Each structure stands twice: as structure tokens, then as C-alpha cells.
């Protein structure tokens, strides 16, 4: 993807200017905040006030991440007086959905980039690779082990978000099931 950036620049330079509202960028699985630098620079050049999540490398939800993410969203909203756009890449998109559910009054919209957003209690709608990675970083019993935890229940119940949501993905990425 990064190799195609020079060829994409002419098109990207015609992207509309932003209105200066805040945006929170969430990295993908095992991605650091540095993995978002190209997106951050692009969005800043387009006029958005973006920040990264401030939690370092994304190794999955860890104790305190849920409350830290919610606090960050609320702080950005309070500081700017404007609702925050959440942009999450891969697993960061799942975190963005969680944050949107927890602080919906502070969120303008959610954009997920190659994020697996369909999760059921048995993990049936989750690709095998993602299940394996989840077992590696989260719990040896897989996605079902966390199905009764409040954060998982929030995503599984799929309450309608009161803000717009855009999901961008590739049919060949191996992370997002085509039926989504």
C-alpha cells in the first residue's frame, strides 16, 4: 500500500479540505502510533485536528485501555467543543466502535479501515487468522471466552450507533469477511 502512495498523491491532493474538527486515530494490531504517520500527516494537511490514541503499540485490549480510550474521546470533545471523528485501522477500528458506543455523545462519526466488525459469541463470523491472533494476544480459548464481558457485549449486541459509520476494506485482505 505504501508503495502506491506516490501514484496516489495527485488524487489525494484533490481530497476536500476538512473543517478543523478533531479526529482520533487508532492503530491496527501490533501497530504503533508511528504506523499512522502518513494518515496523520495527510489529515492534518487537509485541515483536521488529529491525534493518535496515546496508548502505544496496539497489542489488544489491556487492563485500563477501555477507560483510557473513553477518557481520551471525552477529553478531545471537551477541549475542542466539537464532536470527534474516530478512525481505526484493523483492530483499531474495533476499538473505535467500542469508543463510539461508550461516548456516543462525543463522537461525530466512525471510519474503520480493514476492520473485522462482525463478531458473534462463538466467533463464527471471524476469519481463522484473526481467531488465531486473538488467541495469541487475548485468551487461549478464543473470542468466545470474552463474550460475556461488558466490552464484548457492547460490540456483540450491535446497538445502532447514533452517528454515521463508514467501513472501508478490500475483498482480498483476509481480515474482513466478504459478507460484511
Language model region names:
Residues 10-18:
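Short boundary motifs at domain starts and secondary-structure transition points
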